Amino acid sequence: MNGIKLRGTGRCVPANTVTNDDLSRLVDTNDEWITARTGIRSRYRCEKETLTELCVSAARDALHMAGITPADIGVCIVATVSADTVVPSAACLLQRALGLPEDTPCFDLNAACTGFVYALHTMECLLNASDRKSTRLNSSHNNR
C-alpha cells in the first residue's frame, strides 16, 4: 500500500463463547476432530449484541488510538456478510452512530472471508484517487 498508514485499530467480540464441546452437543463431532482440522477451539457468538454495536465499539477504539475524530473520516467501509439489516447498510448505521459527516461516502463490502483484504484495497484506491485523508474500515461478522 503506497503511502497509506494504518493509524488505529479496534476490536470488539461478543460476550458469549462457544466451544467445540458445545458444538458436539448439537452435531455429531468432538473437540479433537474440529481442532485437528481447523485449529479452532472456540469462537464467539452474538446473543444480544448487534453487528452495529460491535462495529461502533471497535471504531471508537480505533479512532482513539489514531488520535482522530469522526469528522476526520472521509470514507466508511464495513466488510461484512452479516449486517443487521439490508437497508440501511452497516456502514450507514455506523456513520450515524459515530456522528460521521453527512457527506461521508459509506458502503458495505460483501466478500466473505476475503472482505477485509478487498476493503483494504478499495480504501487504498479511494484515498489515492481523492483528497480524503482518513477512512474508517470495519471488518465485522455477527454469528447468531
Q: Locations of the language-model features?
A:
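Short acidic/polar active-site loop segments enriched in Thr and Asp
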Residues: 74, 132-133
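Conserved "HGTGT" condensation-loop signature of ketosynthase/thiolase-family condensing enzymes
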Residues: 1-74, 96-98
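Short, acidic Gly/Pro/Ser/Thr-rich loop/turn segments
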Residues: 11-16, 83-85, 144
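Conserved catalytic cysteine-centered active-site region
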Residues: 35-37, 41-53, 81-132
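Conserved beta-strand segments that form the floor/walls of ligand-binding pockets within enzyme
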Residues: 5, 77, 108
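Short glycine-rich or small-residue beta-strand-to-loop segments that form or flank ligand, phosphate
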Residues: 74-81
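Single conserved hydrophobic/aromatic residue that forms the stacking wall/gate
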Residues: 133, 137-144
